[in-house]
Amino acid sequence: MYGNEEAVGEGVRRGMEAYGIPREDIFVITKIYPSQFSEPEAAIDMALQKLDIGYIDMMLLHHPGANDVKAYKVMEQYVEAGKIHSLGLSNWYVEELTEFLPQVDITPALVQNEIHPYYQEQDVVPFIQNQGVVVQCWYPLGGRGYTSELLGNDTLKTIAASHGVSAAQVILRWDLQRGIVVIPGSSNPEHIRENLDLFGFQLRSCA
């Protein structure tokens, strides 16, 4: 879907060669998509070929769909073969997980969902965490047209000012204090540094 596996693989190989970075210090996540669930072996083999980095650290099912259990069970076989090291899900919620989890052998290590202050997932997050599964959020800063609105929210700006940080840092810290892994994206070096600088303040309540 994203069409970047070849570029990611090339970047990993270059980094390993140029800087001596061990492969085990790099963690690559990729996905297979509902349109590929009927032929998961072909999708996984293609991902392995395009990445060309020996193995995939984690593979996710991108969204529930027909043959999702079948696809996941094939992914389990690749784990047994050492070609995939861990498995996860994306866009799975309480109802879908309740039906899905009893049908598979390897509990997903991670569930990746959209989570931000306008989409808080107050019921889903604890449900997933109570299964012993890590929650990761995509679009933590709003996404889908909400980023500017979210970062300009008066309440968030007030909280940010009280801590001497940005609204984006408040949002990311809120996620971290809920035990959620965040994956903000940016090509702006200043924003990247800001997104990493989350540990010098504490929010009072993150329920």
Task: Indicate residue ranges for each PLM-predicted region.
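N-terminal binding-site loop/beta-alpha segment at the start of enzyme catalytic domains
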Residues: 1-26, 141-143
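Ser/Thr-glycine-rich phosphate-binding loops at phosphate-binding pockets of nucleotides
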Residues: 1-4, 56, 89-90, 166
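Short, well-ordered amphipathic alpha-helices
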Residues: 7-17, 44-48, 75-76, 97
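Structured loop/turn residues at beta-strand edges in well-structured enzyme cores
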Residues: 21-24, 51-54, 82, 106, ...
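A short, structured active-site edge motif that brings together acidic residues
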Residues: 22-36, 57-64, 91
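Short, acidic/polar
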Residues: 36-52, 70, 95-99, 119-120
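CE4/NodB-like, metal-dependent polysaccharide N-deacetylase domain
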Residues: 41-61, 77-81, 103
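Beta/alpha (TIM)-barrel catalytic core signal, keyed to glycine-rich beta->alpha loops juxtaposed to Asp/Glu
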Residues: 63-207
